[in-house]
Design a protein with these regions (language model features):
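Cytosolic regulatory regions of ion transport systems
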Residues: 1-437
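Single conserved hydrophobic/aromatic residue that forms the stacking wall/gate
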Residues: 435-446
Length: 446
């Protein structure tokens, strides 16, 4: 597809890299010649220096005939205007990044009235991701599939886990184990697969069955009632608002006095402390060792790493760190900090998923596609037509390909987590997992 990206910052470059590597014809627009030169040296893309709200520049970039224009400059207003102009020129789809909290309540109106395909807010997306992780303290990651209707929870088995040494068919649970990561490899397991301590497994089921599974297998995380947030930026604001609305105790540490005053005004139910959250003495004075969770959200990766390691050392139940450089992920993992969030990656992945769905929905029934397990597994949702070869046949009688799993069936708005006796019917939407070595297409049974 022909894609134009306006803005070559962290997020713009990430999108350019992913989309060009997937074979799309990408043109990047930015006013900074030095940044564009770097991108042009690294990636096989067209680079155009200029202003994204210039009709002449947009036309030169091919916005009039592109399949998608993505505006991710540092200014919300520029992104919105850029998409409006691109639509007028003839761009089929447009996506704008809008980050200002003042626009948050107007996002739906902006998207609908201006004819945008999608609006993204990396800070809000990151806050939502953190909030989900705090709901399930044992989870390292939570993926939402099938347009948010199916949850995939990822967690690590300890060496003494009651699941270690057990084959999946021996698990007396309605939870479906979808993927297992072990020693750098990712597997879609069958019933004979034996779990080991240290495995990172992803499961899906109804919330009730997941809770029961965690209880019976001893995977119990302390319910989080209090959260300490270090840093008072946009993510902290969105997260604190979500937590306060859920009735949790929230304490925010921020060193900028004006920002503290603003947060106190916007978040009356949160306790806002004016102080340096990287000061370990202050952290202890504010009862770090008594809080259920700490989230490090300063503007500096190094501070977030140190704060998170300090909290882990003091056995805080759940520790989450924001990092912009994913190379720090391994360092934190070795230090016992399992959970990290990278805002620009979260939103970039949403856009990449949108692009993949655009590309793969052209005539083959695929409605959405998400990559899991470090990109080794694809989750595909497809609509079942009457001509589908496996209609009305129980899953246990199907000769499914190895490395292929039917994770859920959506029928009449209801999610079914299938057993062997369930069958696929015409009109269903089916969520399947397939190893990336297999070609991306609607399910073939054998």
């Amino acid at each position: 597809m022909k894609i134009v990206i306006v803005g070559d910052g962290k997020m713009g470059f990430t999108l350019t890299r992913h989309l060009s590597e997937e074979g799309h014809d990408v043109t990047v627009i930015d006013h900074n010649a030095e940044i564009l030169e770097r991108t042009g040296d690294i990636l096989d893309v067209a680079c155009l220096r200029g202003d994204g709200i210039s009709l002449a520049v947009l036309a030169e970039a091919g916005a009039d005939e592109c399949d998608l224009l993505i505006a991710v400059t540092s200014r919300d207003e520029v992104n919105i205007i850029c998409c409006m102009l691109a639509r007028k020129l003839g761009a089929r789809h447009t996506i704008a990044r809008v980050r200002n909290p003042e626009y948050a309540k107007s996002l739906f109106f902006i998207r609908e009235e201006l004819g945008l395909s999608m609006l993204i807010n990396p800070e809000m997306d990151a806050a939502t991701e953190i909030f989900r992780l705090l709901r399930f303290p044992t989870a390292l990651k939570i993926d939402f599939l099938a347009k948010g209707r199916v949850e995939l929870l990822t967690f690590r088995l300890t060496a003494d886990s009651p699941l270690a040494g057990k084959a999946l068919h021996a698990l007396k649970s309605r939870v479906l184990v979808c993927t297992v990561q072990r020693d750098g490899a990712v597997y879609i397991p069958d019933g004979d697969f034996v779990l080991q301590g240290g495995d990172t497994i992803s499961v899906t089921a109804s919330p009730k069955d997941v809770a029961a599974f965690f209880h019976t297998t001893g995977i119990r995380g302390q319910k989080i009632k209090s959260v300490m947030i270090v840093g008072g930026g946009k993510i902290s604001f969105y997260l604190a608002r979500l937590l306060c609305e859920s009735g949790l105790q929230v304490k925010i540490l921020e060193k900028d006095k004006e920002r503290c005053d603003l947060l106190s005004e916007l978040l009356p139910r949160a306790m806002v402390i004016c102080g340096d959250g990287s000061d370990q003495t202050l952290l202890m004075e504010e009862d770090l060792d008594r809080t259920d969770a700490l989230v490090a959200l300063t503007n500096m990766d190094e501070e977030n790493v140190i704060i998170s390691m300090f909290a882990t050392l003091h056995e805080v139940g759940k520790v989450i760190a924001k990092i912009n450089h994913i190379s720090l992920d391994k360092i934190l993992e070795k230090s016992g900090v399992d959970c990290t969030v990278t805002p620009h990656l979260i939103s970039s992945n949403q856009i990449v998923q949108y692009v993949r769905a655009m590309q793969n929905s052209r005539g083959n029934g695929v409605e959405s596609m998400v990559r899991l397990g470090s990109g080794a597994v694809e989750a595909l949702e497809f609509h079942v037509k009457e001509s589908f070869e496996a209609c009305d046949v129980s899953l246990k009688t199907l000769a499914l390909k190895k490395e292929l799993l039917i994770a859920s069936i959506i029928r009449g708005g209801k999610v079914i987590y299938p057993t062997g006796s369930d069958c696929i019917r015409a009109g269903d939407n089916v969520l399947s997992l397939i190893h990336i070595s297999e070609p991306t297409r609607p399910i073939s049974i054998s």
